[in-house]
């Protein structure tokens, strides 16, 4: 999904990690490197204040860490309207036309 949407949008990976688990930060970075590749590696933002980032869309499976106050549209991943990545990609591709 990241690679597909990156062809259309200026995409970033915005994630939070527990403060009390320092290895979680490096674990997230390694996960992005391994699964999303070098294109995403330098587009990783780790923040507990997601609402401070600007953008048109935030895809998140939670409303925590500022997602509920994000200034663009929060695509609530895993819920009724967006149960999977196909539904998210289909929606975002339709919005780009």
Predicted regions, residues:
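Substrate-recognition element of Asp-dependent hydrolases with the DxDx(T/V) motif
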Residues: 1-26, 32
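Donor nucleotide-activated moiety binding/catalytic core segment of transferases
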Residues: 37-56
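Surface-exposed, flexible loop/turn segments at secondary-structure boundaries
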Residues: 19, 52, 82
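Short, aromatic/basic amphipathic alpha-helical patches
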Residues: 25-36, 67-71
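Short His-Asn-centered micro-motif
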Residues: 14-16, 47-48, 59-62
């Amino acid at each position: 999904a990241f690679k597909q949407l990156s062809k259309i949008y200026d995409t970033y990976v915005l994630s939070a990690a527990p403060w009390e688990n320092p290895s979680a930060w490096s674990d997230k970075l390694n996960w992005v490197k391994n699964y999303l590749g070098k294109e995403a590696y330098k587009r990783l933002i780790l923040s507990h204040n997601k609402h401070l980032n600007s953008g048109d869309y935030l895809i998140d499976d939670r409303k925590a860490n500022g997602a509920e106050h994000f200034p663009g549209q929060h695509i609530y991943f895993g819920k009724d309207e967006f149960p999977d990545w196909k539904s998210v990609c289909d929606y975002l591709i339709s919005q780009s036309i």
